[in-house]
């Protein structure tokens, strides 16, 4: 399945942009392959990273729906998933576990509400479950633990700059 996104987003990341998933690789050699249907995720962590990137880049609602297990997928439209109400700042993989056709990924995603740029950076800490059927990994569901909380202004910034949050993204 070919997934298209806003061409300006793609153009900005295609050649030299670092992938938002935190792998350190260039987007075209990382999650873009999955987003455009050139490859499929081979493990739960790879799928988790590609889904995070889809949320961060926006315009990839179809990809998010296609990688969500049909039995747990809510009645959302691709357009609803394309709404960018958060600025995604970073992804931290806490733990992964894969056994046969099941897997879990515990992660922390750092974000700030777009409508309130002065808001504190928030952390979404989730344990996501994945299932592989027919060689295709899909997101099942996730448990948020604990509920999203603000990041201290004195903590290292989630963007990875090495600066304190108050001197970087929370400035």
Locate predicted features.
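Short Cys/His-rich zinc-binding micro-motifs
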Residues: 14-25, 153-163
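Short beta-strand edge/turn micro-motifs at domain boundaries
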Residues: 123-150
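Core segments of small alpha/beta cavity-forming domains
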Residues: 33-76, 81
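Cysteine-centered loop/knuckle micro-motif
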Residues: 29-31, 166-169
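Glycine/tyrosine- and acidic-biased, solvent-exposed loop/turn segments at the edges of beta-strands
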Residues: 13-17, 35-41, 149
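Short, flexible, mixed-charge glycine/proline-rich loop motifs
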Residues: 2-14, 145-152
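Surface-exposed, charged secondary-structure patches
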Residues: 84-123
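Short, surface-exposed charged micro-motifs
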Residues: 18, 95, 127-129, 156
């Amino acid at each position: 399945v070919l997934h298209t996104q806003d061409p300006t987003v793609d153009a900005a990341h295609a050649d030299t942009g670092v992938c938002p998933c935190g792998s350190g690789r260039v987007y075209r050699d990382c999650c873009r392959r999955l987003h455009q249907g050139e490859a499929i995720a081979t493990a739960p962590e790879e799928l988790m990273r590609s889904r995070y990137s889809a949320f961060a880049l926006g315009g990839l609602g179809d990809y998010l729906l296609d990688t969500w297990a049909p039995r747990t997928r809510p009645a959302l439209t691709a357009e609803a998933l394309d709404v960018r109400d958060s600025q995604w700042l970073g992804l931290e993989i806490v733990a992964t576990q894969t056994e046969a056709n099941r897997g879990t990924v515990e992660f922390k995603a750092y974000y700030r509400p777009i409508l309130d740029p002065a808001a504190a950076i928030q952390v979404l800490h989730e344990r996501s479950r994945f299932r592989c059927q027919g060689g295709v990994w899909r997101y099942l569901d996730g448990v948020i633990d604990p509920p999203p909380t603000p990041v201290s202004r004195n903590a290292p910034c989630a963007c990875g700059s090495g600066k304190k949050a108050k001197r970087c993204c929370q400035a």
